[in-house]
């Protein structure tokens, strides 16, 4: 009985030691996804604080019609006193391909309030395309979440 118990204990210790292998560094895809998430958080934070330069630092110089996008965002910052922008991180998919850009699809919602108290609510599902090397926003596929519904035609 004692031999059996000792044998079981030794087997348990051997398996425990084998399970405690060395830590492996995160794979490149995980590092890229973390960079994209960090950029998204930075975009959302700068947008809510209405910090145009910080916001545009996270947008690639290759973004289509970047100057018009910047002017549109500046107009929104001027028009609305309070902006609340929420990303639903639990409903997100990040696709990373070694040879192309990475794409992050997520749900979002926002509230834009004017000085007069009028509130515009909007939300939806959108895909952001990121440069895998620098994790900067290259393009938006779908409705632009940074332009509220009533302003969509005035970009």
Predicted feature locations:
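Short beta-strand edge/turn micro-motifs at domain boundaries
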Residues: 22-24, 119-155
């Amino acid at each position: 009985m004692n031999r059996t118990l000792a044998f079981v204990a030794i087997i348990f210790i051997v398996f425990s030691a084998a399970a405690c292998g060395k830590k492996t560094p995160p794979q490149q895809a995980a590092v890229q996804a973390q960079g994209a998430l960090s950029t998204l958080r930075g975009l959302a934070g700068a947008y809510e604080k209405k910090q145009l330069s910080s916001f545009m630092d996270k947008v690639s110089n290759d973004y289509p019609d970047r100057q018009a996008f910047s002017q549109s965002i500046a107009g929104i910052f001027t028009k609305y006193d309070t902006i609340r922008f929420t990303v639903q991180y639990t409903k997100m998919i990040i696709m990373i391909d070694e040879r192309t850009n990475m794409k992050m699809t997520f749900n979002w919602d926002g509230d834009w309030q004017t000085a007069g108290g009028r509130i515009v609510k909007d939300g939806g599902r959108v895909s952001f395309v990121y440069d895998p090397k620098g994790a900067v926003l290259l393009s938006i596929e779908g409705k632009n979440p940074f332009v509220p519904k009533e302003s969509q035609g005035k970009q």
